[in-house]
Amino acid sequence: NTDTSANWIVLSGTNADENDDAYDAALGDFTVDFAFDYSTRGIPPAPNSGDKSTRGVRISVNNNDDTTGSEAMGVNLFPAKQNFSGNYAVRVDMWINYNGPAGGGTGSTEHAIFGMNQSGEQVGWSSQPTGDGVWFGVDGEGGSSTDYYSFEADDSGTVSPLPPDLAGMVGKNNTHPVYQFLFPSPAFETQGAPGKNWVSVEVRQDDDVLSWVMNGMVIASRPASDEFFGVRTEGTVMLGYMDLFNSIANPKEDNFVV
């Protein structure tokens, strides 16, 4: 309900060439609005906002620049000066907004991302070759060849998107029967995808088991520690948003996550 921006670290990454004149514009092509009144977009109070406040953190990416400098990018938010280990979890109410009807419109596919065991010093998103910790991602309208992502960084800092079998994940596309059941139509505009609705999201580490939970259903679970890859099992949590594509949404103001 209040502006807590001073308590967060914000980092961004882009696939633009660092030597390109448009690099700085691409790297800064995001917005993070703390204490945003999302009722102005017709969104009801989040189910876990005890005081029924309609304020939250709104994030958008790759929507500010209409020039050829528009590039795929991601942005991460980390709580400042926080470190966790052992059994812990990050839980949020998430609303992914997208332009267009069921299945989305022009440039609608963007992913909300969330993770743990991060250093808070590196950006985690799909096109970043290095990073740390673990994180997951989901789009709002099933518009990608991979709607549900799982990422992991090894002890050398190399980031890999994990296939569902290694991630312990149900599947990667919104057409999977479990996602179709979890996010049914017409309650959800795009069946199998969580967009344009409040969805509870939890990423937890419990007795060396890493789990991703949405609306109470475990959709990914695997050992938190991985001796082969040397995955981190302590650190801070991360919330974020990423656009895997250079295209701009139209209308661009409809694409964001709260």
Across the structure, where does each feature detected by a protein language model lie?
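Carbohydrate-binding surfaces in secreted/extracellular proteins
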Residues: N1-T2, V92, T190-A224
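Boundary/junction segments of secreted and surface-exposed precursor proteins
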Residues: N1-T4, V237
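Extracellular glycan-recognition surfaces and repeat-rich motifs
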Residues: D3-R58, N63-N64
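Solvent-exposed loop and beta-edge segments used for protein-protein assembly and interaction
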Residues: D51-S53, N83-Y88, T106-S108, A193-N197, ...
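Secretory/extracellular carbohydrate-interaction modules
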Residues: R55-N173
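Trp-centered recognition loops
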Residues: S85-Y88, D93, N174-E202
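Residue-level detector of short, conserved catalytic/binding motifs and their immediate flanks
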Residues: Y88-V90, A112, V134, V199-V201, ...
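Ligand-recognition surfaces built from glycine- and aromatic
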Residues: D226-V258
